[in-house]
Structures are given as C-alpha cells and as structure tokens.
Curated annotation (Swiss-Prot):
GO terms for molecular function: DNA binding; structural constituent of chromatin. Heterodimer of an alpha and a beta chain. It comes from Shewanella woodyi (strain ATCC 51908 / MS32). InterPro entries: Hist_DNA-bd, Histone-like_DNA-bd_CS, IHF-like_DNA-bd_dom_sf, IHF_alpha. Pfam families: Bac_DNA_binding. The keyword Transcription applies. GO terms for biological process: DNA recombination; positive regulation of metabolic process; regulation of DNA-templated transcription; regulation of translation. This is Integration host factor subunit alpha. HAMAP family: IHF_alpha. Belongs to the bacterial histone-like protein family.
Length: 97
C-alpha cells in the first residue's frame, strides 16, 4: 500500500486539528517547494529523512525490446533519493519486528 498526498493531508487534519483544505494546501506547498528546487538545479536536504539530488546520465546504447533494433538512449537529468541514516535505521528496526 502506498501513502498518498490525500492521506498525508488527512493525517495533518487529525493530528494538528487544522481544516482539511488548509492541510491539503500545506501538503501541496511542501511538494511544490521540492519540485521547484529540483527544477532550478538545487539539492533538497531533509534532515533526518534524506537527500534528493539531480544526476546527469550520459547517452548510452539501448535496444527496442519489440524489434531488437539498436537505438540510442538520450542523455538526461534524473532525480535520485538517498535516505538519511535515521530513516535507514528506523526502516531496519521496523522490518526487524
């Protein structure tokens, strides 16, 4: 099961007692801030959680799986996420139970 933005907003509503519209706007604003930072080439560091980075990938050879034809995969920039040590530890502890 995946955690959705709607579920995050619902949790804010229940935990903080703010109205649902404000909770939804807060979640949207949070993700928009991350999106804008990455679009402008910035790294996003969330203390205790992890880092979102941009990585440039070079062009490389590929193959069309239907035809077997060799095709180039173009160079592109991708978003990567590296979990922080606290997050890694908590996930490991949760899985150990």
């Amino acid at each position: 099961m995946a955690l959705t933005k709607a579920e995050m907003a619902e949790h804010l509503f229940e935990t903080l007692g703010i109205n649902k519209r404000v909770a939804k706007e807060m979640v949207e604003a949070f993700f928009e801030e991350i999106r804008q930072a990455l679009e402008s080439g910035e790294q996003v560091k969330l203390s205790g959680f992890g880092n979102f980075d941009l990585r440039d990938k070079n062009q490389r050879p590929g193959r069309n799986p239907k035809t077997g034809e060799d095709i180039p995969i173009s160079a592109r920039r991708v978003v990567t996420f590296r979990p922080g040590q606290k997050l890694k530890s908590r996930v490991e502890e949760a899985n150990a139970k």
